[in-house]
């Protein structure tokens, strides 16, 4: 279901060598580092492709609910000035959510498990290389069908991430 580039990247994250992949090619996985979540969200706005003749779904996937809360608030605020329909096409998927919409979804890796999106933007702290964070990156990466952006972030609102 994923492109070769996304599946190979996810297998590398999980330490799975030489798995035979379906030959559906796409855009290479994009890796980038940002100072904070706000800078990452600005970059996401530049790359998101939703609309006619583009993708139907995109996800911004974070490590924790606290990080997803901040990312969702920033993204929604930035989208409001663009004419994007945040009422019907923006979804913050959290543990109390009762519905899912096409468009942009912001969530955590553990709530994204089992879902698929055309574009996925993964935003995790650079410092966190724990086993759980590695598993989270793998889960998030495998949600992408066509394009995957792996973003690492150094700080949240001027405070360094906790590991």
Would you name each region that the model predicts?
Residues 1-7, 15-17, 23, 38, ...:
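Core RecA-like ATPase module of SF1/SF2 helicases and allied nucleic-acid translocases
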Residues 14-16, 30-31:
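A structural preference for long, well-packed, hydrophobic secondary-structure segments
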Residues 22-46:
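Glycine-rich phosphate-binding "P-loop"
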């Amino acid at each position: 279901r994923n492109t070769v580039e996304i599946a190979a990247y996810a297998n590398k994250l999980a330490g799975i060598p030489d798995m035979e992949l379906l030959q559906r090619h796409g855009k290479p996985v994009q890796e980038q580092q940002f100072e904070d979540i706000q800078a990452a969200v600005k970059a996401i706005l530049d790359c998101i492709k939703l609309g006619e003749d583009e993708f139907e779904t995109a996800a911004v996937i974070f490590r924790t609910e606290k990080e997803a809360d901040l990312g969702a608030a920033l993204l929604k605020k930035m989208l409001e000035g663009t004419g994007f329909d945040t009422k019907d096409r923006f979804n913050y998927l959290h543990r109390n959510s009762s519905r899912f919409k096409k468009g942009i979804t912001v969530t955590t890796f553990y709530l994204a498990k089992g879902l698929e999106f055309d574009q996925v933007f993964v935003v995790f702290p650079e410092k966190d290389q724990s086993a759980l964070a590695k598993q989270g990156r793998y889960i998030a990466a495998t949600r992408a069908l066509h394009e995957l952006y792996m973003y690492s972030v150094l700080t949240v609102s001027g405070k360094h991430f906790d590991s």
